[in-house]
Amino acid sequence: MSSSRREPPEAPSIDHLVVADWLGQLQDASFDRAGPAVRKAYPPQRRMTGQQLASYLLRRTYALASSTRPDGRAHAAPTLFSAYAEAFWLPTVKDAARIAHVRAHPWLALSILEGEHDTHAAVLIEGPAEVLTTVPEDLRHITELRNRGGTIAWAAYWLRITPQRLFSFAEHAWQEG
């Protein structure tokens, strides 16, 4: 087993079934609206189930966030993230470039990947985003636990993504692992 497939960090109890149901429904709706090329690239037998999505996203703590610079050029950077209240939340330092990017183009994409070749898996999420200065205390606590108990006092801003699309892909060996 690859080292990236470790146990999830301890976190407050979350209604795993509710999260799994939300993610599964979001993915189903995304594929219903997707074109034939996307449906062919992500065949049903390679998609994660709602339960697999919930477990995977709880276990993975970092994503690649893609935004658009004010001048239209692409920008990507790794970020800590948490799923909370049917949204994805990114704690962000005060002077992070993505703050200006989201204010200019309020949309983000997240890519959460692991493994290689026969054991790789990916979740792609995109949707409108907004910049916030305050978040629920539960979210701060969850995110600190996901950050291995490290403080997130550095988070001057939070980006909240309300996902409109979610696609997943998992090779058979990943699904069997």
Map each language-model feature to its residues.
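Charged, gly/pro-rich active-site loop segments
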Residues: M1-M48, H117-G177
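Short, conserved active-site entrance elements at the starts or edges of catalytic domains
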Residues: A37-R69
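Short beta-strand segments in beta-sandwich/barrel cores
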Residues: A63, F88, L108, A129-E130, ...
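Short, surface-exposed beta-strand-loop junctions and turns on beta-sheet-rich folds
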Residues: A96-R98, Q175-E176
